[in-house]
Amino acid sequence: MAKKGALTGLLLFGIFFGAGNLIFPPSLGALSGEHFLPAIAGFVFSGVGIAVLTLIIGTLNPKGYIYEISTKIAPWFATLYLSVLYLSIGPFFAIPRTATTAYEVGISPLLSDANKGLGLIVFTLLYFAAAYLISLNPSKILDRIGRVLTPVFAILIVILVVLGAFKYGGTSPQAASAAYQASAFGTGFLEGYNTLDALASVAFSVIAVQTLKQLGFSSKKEYISTIWVVGIVVALAFSALYIGLGFLGNHFPVPAEAMKGGTPGVYILSQATQEIFGSTAQLFLAAMVTVTCFTTTVGLIVSTAEFFNGRFPQISYKVYATVFTLIGFAIANLGLSAIIKYSIPVLVILYPITIAIVMIVIVNKFVALSKPGMQLTIAVVTAIAIASVLGSSFKVEFLANLVNVLPFAKASLPWLVPAIVGILLSLVLPNKQESDVFEMD
């Protein structure tokens, strides 16, 4: 049980941990200053806690989120929501973003300006070709990522963090930004959303279930116990690296110019690597970032292709993997800024819906909930999320004003209280539904 859980946990940690997970903790460390401890606590609580909880809930029932959403909300909504989610964190946004980030942080500094355009094409071609070849045989993903690539990038990050702690641990933190001075834990909590790992947890729960099935279980009790081991392994690995990278950022001397953009993480990683490793710095950084991003890319190709093949089996897994890899390759060559610009509104809509679904599933594990009440809750949260994006990103003023009167709107959580009210109503509305008790195949 422990071995199965540890192996699956390492696989999922390797797939989850991408470039964003490298950049955000040192940024938080630099910006939080003397308020680092409550800030990193908030970051770990949201960036690790919500993601791991979403993952555990998705794997406690081997039928996965597609079944949970279909039975609690509606089959058509499950298909629509999960299709948009997988396409967003898959070929249209996250897959190309991992490749472009790996290139811009790790490879681009090694090239002259004249060769950077061609360099991106060549790098992404080789990058996606390798990811595609591994993804063609998803049954081998545990061996190829969990046992090989994950230890490689984890060791590289640990080396940087440990050497950085010895070199800069005695340096005093800089003054905290206004946001962290006002609410260190709250700001850190909201920064944890930037990892978007709660969305990825929905997708990667498919890989978790498939991997666990391959390992085989003699009873439901063993399966459930192993899932908790998986969650503990993922949580501990994430927390340790987040705290280490945050500590590095907290003590690394960052000039005022680098702090102005509000995200000094890239600067800290680059400069700390150069100062620690000297002439070999860029090669070390290139290896660390590329391997980190690559594991995420493979996991996203596999999980997205498996979802669509399971939902629309008329098309083979191989065709889906091929198409999604080609789309990722094409979009990656648009550049990182373009990918981030177009992805943010979609992800901001998906995140509240995902958390609301997880809240419903958790509560329903313990008490019966009204199906109309659950449907109403998701409908209201979806409407608020869409209104928030239209109001903030597309400047629809009357929608922005409506959203801003809701509790916690200033904390970017206008949907939270309506979601809680909806779940409370589901306790008293008719047509109650018990959570299904799954049986092992």
Regions found by a protein language model. Give the residues of each.
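Hydrophobic, membrane-embedded alpha-helices of multi-pass small-molecule transporters
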Residues: 9-17, 163-169, 179-245, 284-293, ...
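Selective recognition of specific alpha-helical transmembrane segments in multi-pass small-molecule
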Residues: 49, 53, 152-164, 227-253, ...
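Membrane-water interface regions at transmembrane-helix termini and the short interhelical loops
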Residues: 60-64, 68, 127-149, 214-217, ...
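TM-loop-TM module centered on a large, flexible mid-protein loop between adjacent transmembrane helices
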Residues: 65-71, 241-294, 345
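Hydrophobic alpha-helical segments and their helix-loop junctions in multi-pass secondary transporters
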Residues: 91, 95, 154-180, 198-199, ...
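Membrane-interface loop-to-helix entry segments
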Residues: 135-164, 343-355, 374-382
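Hydrophobic, small-residue-rich membrane helices and short re-entrant helix-turn-helix hairpins
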Residues: 137-148, 185, 208-237, 255-267, ...
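A generic transmembrane alpha-helix motif of multi-pass inner-membrane proteins
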Residues: 370, 374-441
